[in-house]
């Protein structure tokens, strides 16, 4: 709506007259057609949200959830620098994410694919009191996508290289080190 002042005169009103202009397509409204056909047609290629991993770690307590690799409070990682991780839980917005961990001076624990902060058998990879020194993630049934992940170990502020799939793992299995931070990302193949 646009308002302006006219210098013209209107009978019965002294001085300038304020007029309101409203840009409405009244002929279309009168004919019953209020929008164009283009406006009624949905977009041909709506943008789908990018797939994301959601994950948490247990360091004596469950830390906050990281989702989509962009939690501003954690710079996109789960963990606390120089504090060991004992458990990991993770899920993906597409496909099925399975994962497992290696415990220091121990072995690879079984694969899990649930997402839980209470089920240490099906929804958490890890074991209470057992420090994690290696992790593996695998994304199943997600055509065109895979999981990429990396870890940081105690004694360094840097991350180890990114790992894709299960041909390798993130961490260092040597009996001395432990993982203190992880990052997980769902990416196109």
Regions found by a protein language model. Give the residues of each.
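Lectin-type carbohydrate-recognition ectodomains
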Residues: 40-189
């Amino acid at each position: 709506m646009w308002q302006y002042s006219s210098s013209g005169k209107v009978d019965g009103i002294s001085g300038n007259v304020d007029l309101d202009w409203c840009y409405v397509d009244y002929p279309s409204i009168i004919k019953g057609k209020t929008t164009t056909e283009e406006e009624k047609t949905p977009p041909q290629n709506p943008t789908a949200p990018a797939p994301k991993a959601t994950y948490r770690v247990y360091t004596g307590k469950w830390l906050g959830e990281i989702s989509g690799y962009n939690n501003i409070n954690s710079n996109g990682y789960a963990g606390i620098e120089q504090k060991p991780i004992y458990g990991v839980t993770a899920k993906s917005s597409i496909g099925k994410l399975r994962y497992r961990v290696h415990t220091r001076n121990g072995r690879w624990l079984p694969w899990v694919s649930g997402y839980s902060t209470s089920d240490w058998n099906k929804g958490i990879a890890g074991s209470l009191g057992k420090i994690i020194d290696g992790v593996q993630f695998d994304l199943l049934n997600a055509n065109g996508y895979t999981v990429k992940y990396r870890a940081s170990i105690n004694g360094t502020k840097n991350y180890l290289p990114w790992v894709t799939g299960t041909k390798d793992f993130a961490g260092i299995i040597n009996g001395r080190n432990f993982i203190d931070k992880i990052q997980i990302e769902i990416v196109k193949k």
